[in-house]
Structure formats: C-alpha cells, structure tokens
C-alpha cells in the first residue's frame, strides 16, 4: 500500500499480513475515493473502522486539518501507530490534529457527539458483513456528527443491499470496483 497524493505521495504504508482479518482499501479504490472527495485540504475528517490508518493518512497527506481515527483491533492499532510515526507524526501529541480513539465505532459516535464534534468528511470502511451499514445509518441519525454540507463516504460490498432510501442523507455518488462499491452521501 502507498499514499497516492499530497505531501507524503508515494510513501509506503504498512499493511497487515495476508492471514490477518483486515481488508485494507486497495490503492486504486482509495485514489478514486479521494478524487470524488476533493478538496480535502483544511477539512476535519473522521475515519471509522480505520484499520491501519490507510484512508485517514491519505487525508492528512492531502491537507486535512484534523483526522480522528476510530479502530478497536489491537493489531490494526499497532500498525496504524507505526504508519503515523513512520511519516513523522505523533498521534499522542496534543493539538497535533491527529487523534486515535481505540474503541468500538458506536461508542466513538457517542463520544464524539458528547464532545460536540462535527466533521466535514466521515469515512467508513466497515467489515463486509450483514448489518454493519444499517448500524452506521442508525448511528448517523442518533449522533449527528456530520456538518451541514459534509460528506459521508462508505466502502462496502456490492452484495450489501442495506443502503436504503431512508438513509439520513441523499446519495450523491457511487462507483463500482469489482466487488467493492464506494458510496457518497451529502448532508444537505
């Protein structure tokens, strides 16, 4: 895996071993996602199911002002920390614009809402399993942490048909890459 664009362009990002249950976003899909999201510069971004930090690091490289990573798996957190530090970033430094929340996604939504946080971009690359997208929909309704005009971008399986018309925001774009769909929703 590598960083596609920005100040860290072409730098390598550590990936999990092939046997690990982590499915990082492929470079081609990541590039397409960020082309759909442009511009990212100056935005506040939350990366849910962050894994190794691949998407959030791409956002940092492209000039995001703040990135919050949400991931609970210890192996992923270790790789994320190594990836950030390998690029000269200290995720533990206060005021550094980088925060790692090492808890389950639903608890992170609650925490961020309680803190009054609102983001320009929400990224989600959940496991390809039944029920996850519906849970994300419910969390977005219960804890509205996406700014007016903000984008919620989710990577999911083409087989996952849970994205309903009742989703809290209208779908603005969708692209297919093999078994993967990138779907973008806009708040307002």
Model region roles, listed by residue range:
Residues 1-188:
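Class I S-adenosyl-L-methionine-dependent methyltransferase catalytic core
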